[in-house]
A protein has these predicted regions:
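Glycine-rich phosphate-binding loop and adjoining beta1-alpha1-beta2 segment
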Residues: 26-62
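Short acidic low-complexity segments
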Residues: 66-79
Length: 445
């Protein structure tokens, strides 16, 4: 049997040990012969630390998986079967700017929502599309599995602006939501099924089942009563307004707090901002501690401290997806794919996050039809933001970027949109070559 070749771009990421653990665990059904970890020269030291740990993990497990490290992406991609992307263009320093600049204007500063999400997309999409061009030449049959944030917007750009059709976006949020529901009901997560539909970081659980019996109202009652947190590591856990959750009647995701509890979330962020600690700084500290652990030549497993990063279950989700495509499992997973009519009211060529049957030919979305009226509008508004943002990222069109910023529901005015856009274009200009010389004439820096 010819083994499988997986290439992970952004291989020096602190998440990589989880990916390696997931591949080791599945070796019987998913025989990975080569795992190539690719990074850029600036990330070389981290790549070497993570790579050495990966080799120790593989050796301890006794599986014949070769770990290759390189900063030459094209060398790695030749004849790959699966390519995963987990890149952060501009590293965490760029994330800190994405969070801090909007807060200066009294606007939510967050990695994947609002102005921060827009700029992360503007920096990341051109790089991902470059990777797509390499894939087209060097491994045209490979599956691209992206978990760089904002995952939905990046999948949207790949589907609409690259010739690659074998592309899937992946997020750990649906798994995290399922784990949370299991915790609320005090049962094992594999007994829970949730019908997910929406967009990335804008996904709803339309129905919740325990052993095949509908328990949606029971779960919403538990969430409404404030008995247990329903959020993720990086999002504060405010009490939901009980009657609102009951009226909504479906399960929101943790990121919906930015839209339904904007004031509380902003106040909380501003407190941190004034103390000079945003989420990016917290993560920078966590990363430092993780890499100290990874350096230890005696460490040969994934350290439990990795769970503190918001991305727990990410890599496990990736391994499950690869396993199901490779083995034509036809199980149900929640991924970002081309809509093709699965959700009415969203363009067919747009990315949606939805339950899919995973086959050897990729994910097949399970149609849900119309989303409930009270949430349909927000989802469509975010989709029009994403489509406009993707176009701005590809064309470097200043006015398209301004439009994307202004129509985002977290941005309070056209004037604030322009000020933030100009300041963030300047702050990130080293990572935004497509916008060269296109800033508006009267931008004041």
């Amino acid at each position: 049997v010819k083994g499988i070749k997986i290439v992970t771009i952004g291989g020096g990421s602190s998440y990589t040990p989880e990916l390696v653990e997931g591949l080791i665990k599945r070796y019987e059904t998913l025989p990975v012969r080569e795992l190539w970890l690719v990074d850029i020269p600036k990330g070389k030291e981290k790549l070497e630390i993570v790579g050495a740990l990966a080799r120790r993990m593989v050796e301890k497990a006794g599986v014949p998986m070769e770990i290759h490290l390189t900063c030459d992406r094209r060398e790695a991609l030749k004849d790959a079967d699966f390519v995963t992307t987990q890149i952060r263009v501009g590293f965490l320093a760029a994330r800190a700017k994405d969070e801090r600049i909007p807060l200066k204007y009294g606007v939510i500063g967050q990695e994947t929502n609002g102005p921060g999400g827009l700029f992360k997309a503007l920096r990341t999409i051109p790089v991902i599309l470059d990777i797509c061009r390499d894939i087209e030449q060097l491994c045209p049959n490979a599956w691209l599995i992206n978990f760089s944030n904002p995952a939905g917007l990046i999948t949207e750009a790949v589907l609409r602006y690259s010739p690659i059709r074998k592309a899937v976006g992946l997020c750990n949020l649906p798994i995290g939501m399922r784990m949370n529901v299991a915790r609320l009901l005090e049962v094992n997560a594999d007994r829970i099924h949730i019908d997910f539909a929406g967009l990335n970081h804008m996904v709803f659980g339309l129905n919740i089942y325990l052993d095949g019996k509908e328990v949606t109202d029971r779960v919403l009652d538990l969430i409404a009563s404030g008995e247990a947190g329903d959020t993720v590591k990086n999002i504060p856990d405010f009490q939901w307004e009980q009657d609102f959750i009951k009226a909504l009647g479906i399960l929101p995701c943790p990121y919906h707090r930015y839209y339904y509890q904007t004031k509380q979330m902003l106040d909380e962020q501003l407190k941190d901002y004034k103390r000079n600690v945003t989420r990016a700084e917290v993560v920078q500290q966590l990363e430092k501690e993780l890499f100290e652990l990874y350096r230890d030549p005696h460490l040969n497993i994934k350290p439990p401290q990795l769970e503190k990063r918001g991305g727990a279950y990410y890599s496990d989700a990736a391994c499950s997806l690869i396993d199901s495509i490779y083995n034509d499992k036809k199980d149900i997973q929640t991924v970002n794919v081309r809509n093709n009519g699965a959700i009415s009211g969203i363009p067919a060529d747009s990315a949606v996050e939805i339950n899919c049957v995973i086959t050897k030919d990729g994910p097949r979305p399970i149609s849900v039809g119309e989303l409930p009226v009270p949430v349909q509008g927000l989802v469509q508004q975010i989709k029009s933001f994403e489509r406009t943002a993707a176009e701005a990222a590809v064309t470097g069109d200043y006015h398209k970027a301004l439009l994307a910023m202004a129509i985002n529901p977290l941005v309070p005015s056209d004037a604030a949109a322009k000020q933030m856009l100009d300041e963030m274009l300047e702050a990130h200009k080293g990572y935004l070559p497509q916008f060269k010389g296109l800033q508006s004439a009267n931008a004041s820096y």
